Amino acid sequence: MSNAAPATVSRIEPANWYAGMKNPTLQLMLTGNGIREAEVTTDYPGAKIDSLVRLESPNYLLVYLNLSGAQPGDMKLRITFSKGKKGKKAIVTYPLLKREKAGEERMGFTNKDVLYMLMPDRFAQGHRDSKPVKMKTQYAIDRSQPSLRHGGDLEGIRQHLDYFTELGVTALWFTPVLENDSPDNNGASTYHGYATTDYYKVDPRFGTNEEYRRLTDEAHQKGLKIVMDMIFNHCGMEHPWVSDLPSQDWLNAPEWLAAPKQAPTAVAEGQSTTYAGGINDLYLQTSYKLTPVVDPYASEIDKRETVDGWFVPSMPDLNQRNPHVMRYLIQNSIWWIETIGIDGIRMDTYPYADAKGMASWMKELNQEYPNFNVVGESWVTEPAFTAALQKDSRITPPYMLGCKPCPAANNSKPCPKANDNKPCPVANNSKHCPRVCDNIADTPTPPNTWLNTVMDFSFFDRLNAAKYEETDPWWNGMNRIYNNFVYDYLYPNPKSVLAFLDNHDTDRFLGDGKDSLMLKQALALLLTINRIPQLYYGTEIMMNGTKAVTDGNVRKDFPGGFPGDERSAFTKEGRTKEENSMFRWLSKVLHWRQQSKAVTEGRQVQFTPYKGVYVMAHQLPTCAQAATCAQAATCPQATTCGSPNQPGTATPAGATVPGASASGSNVLLILNGTSKPATFNAERYKELWPAGQQATITAREVTSGRKYDITKDFTLSPRQTLLLEY
């Protein structure tokens, strides 16, 4: 007699799906003891099982269905666990739900939004009377320890939605909230959320899937969007896949897991945390260097370390080249969009994952949700790198997406161009030349990442270098900012690039100081440039800190968010005089920005810093310019003067053109980049004056209401910021 445990099905992922998706394919991952050899059938109308994929582990079975004709309802899956008449059978009811809205109706975040980034564990605790949640692994909640959990949750965020609307932000991005059931390790924990152990479940310490949906619904009612942080590059060590690999190629470089471990060791130079399980010589650590993915001269070892190396030993590296892994991840992102109603995704460690797999994900999301948005974290401070990752980039290297020319027969003659789709002259003409970037782009040249938004680490880097400098005639201070935008021609869409001063992985912009003048200059820039702005929680009350000792020093608890806090910075009464001053100033700018078409739709103009002063303008076209534009052979986008104007559709004389009003059509940002008084030389900027107007031009300062005549010189105080509108 066999002592083997009976076959079972203990889990199906995803637990439900949605009828009417543009891609009719559904992958179901069945998990259970001995499930690999099971047979699965269904007679549900409009559904057909295309294939069963039996992986190396006996405890997984992948079922691929085609749902092209299926309507919402309960689909019956008949599972036979062994062959023969006496084989154990089961019927599983699988819900196919009706979509709440069409994919085209899901609107993502744009440059008209301002994202507020926070860490749920450190922002606010809503469930204050509940006992600690029991998890499989050991953990502690201790607010005195910067690297342990502090107890914040989704309910705490929900309870403070009015705070965000008062401040004036329009979207919330918080670090991952999915289950991270990993043990504390040498005084550190996964409170940050980047070590997923269940891709379909909110971590119980943060709340439930239902609470996530409630938070999202109420945020939408208040005009706030929700951006979900996801990680395709890696999972957590305690994910069930790691202890029972579906297949050996489910992870990159998994060999070290089966070999004896050495004593615990530091995971990377300069990193204080250690991995309790130890590592061995087979362990492949990522180099954290992203440039090999675009480097035309990159060595194979450098590319492998970047893409296949593990971020840390406790975060196994997923293999996106495995089509089953990629299908699982793509479906997971779609499931959260449909189930929770999120408005965007921030993809962590984007270039560390396989570029071709990520492009296939982005292409499918673009097709399913054409107005949705995804931002990929791409931590390289050179614009050419991040621009190469953006959708429709002209500089994306083909080899980055795995594009290769076909081999010529015996090297006797060159292979035809990859995009002519002709037979390749291989031996006996037995093969055809594969299309470059097959399954990535409709046309193989140029390759396309399909990623709408990238992160502007170049702006972050230049701004943080410039903040303590005096602006000289050439390179330092505001010259760094000016030169950053010189390279915007590399981006297909600069207005869809996300800019920021700091985040949870960097020093706070203020460092250990409290320089309000420096912060106001940076914020004024951030909120007016051709970008999608992102703020880090607490900036509005001048929270500071550096990572010199620990990451937790830049991830401090928001005052008033937790039981026992002495004060609450959520209220005017709980903030200090200095904090209220910054909060009021920033709130005015944020609320003004929501109404400023000049900032979000206008043309950006910048002037080289002159005698320490940096000037940037945003202009909407006037009615006269719109009329001229309408008669031109080519027409710049002018959404406020028509929709937009097309050649030959001149604006009638005297007509009122929506949005082309005199007041508010122009925004002028003036920054004194020195610690001394400086002069605004009006004559230098007269091209910004409305046509035919040489007399007084009165501009209103947005935060103070003070009036300035921009046709006259005036003096700027040290590090002064003027945000003018006229």
Predicted regions and their residues:
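Carbohydrate-binding surface patches
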Residues: 591, 607-624, 649, 657-688
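C-terminal beta-strand-rich structural cap/linker in extracellular carbohydrate-active enzymes
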Residues: 708-726
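Low-complexity, Pro/Ser/Thr- and charge-rich linker/hinge segments at domain boundaries
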Residues: 96-117, 122, 126
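Edge beta-strands of extracellular beta-sandwich domains
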Residues: 88-97
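Substrate-binding/active-site clefts of carbohydrate-active enzymes
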Residues: 124-334, 339, 358-369, 373, ...
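Beta-strand/beta-sandwich contexts
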Residues: 5-36, 96-99
